[in-house]
Amino acid sequence: LTGQNIPVTVHMRQEGGDVLGALEEMLTVARVLRIPVHISHLKAMGRDNWGTKIPQALSMLEQARQEGLDVGCDVYPYTAGSTQLIHILPPDFLTGGMEAVVPRLRDKDARRELAERIRRGDGFDDIAKLAGWDGIRLTSLHCPEDHPYQGKSIAEIAALWGQNPLDCCCDLLVREHCEITMVDFMATEEDIVTILQSP
């Protein structure tokens, strides 16, 4: 690809706390390979990043353009995303597929480790931390006894069950064999407008 005018369009590896580090990696790719780079769905996920990371990211892109690089971005135009609930788990927790994940979710020691990793943050886009348990709403549940919880947040369900949100989430994942979808609210309208208004 070096020196060819073939654009590389990417979803960055991190869109939360290290979104600027991930952007710098892609700008380095543009510099080293001398190719156009387009960032797809630029966003800064998580309340801690709202209003601060996007202006910095846009400034980095503008500076790169002033250096002569052909770089740009588009915007994810929604404040929420939709995916499977298992994506609150670190990628390595999913090793072995659902046949391994479900027993792991039952294990109290594994849950304690999971809680610590979510609290600490360890490099993955941690949806539980970025959206908050109140920002994760369940959109499909298969077991009839869970149907009343459709549309409710993990925080709401945990309060109804008298549990902490992580245990509630793990219990639901076990019962539903990890086949739960969610809407996660982790972006802000202000950042979307800022990106849309940038040159």
Indicate residue ranges for each PLM-predicted region.
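Hydrophobic, small-residue-rich alpha-helical packing segments that form membrane-like cores
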Residues: L1-L33
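Active-site neighborhoods of metal-dependent hydrolases
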Residues: P36, H41-P199
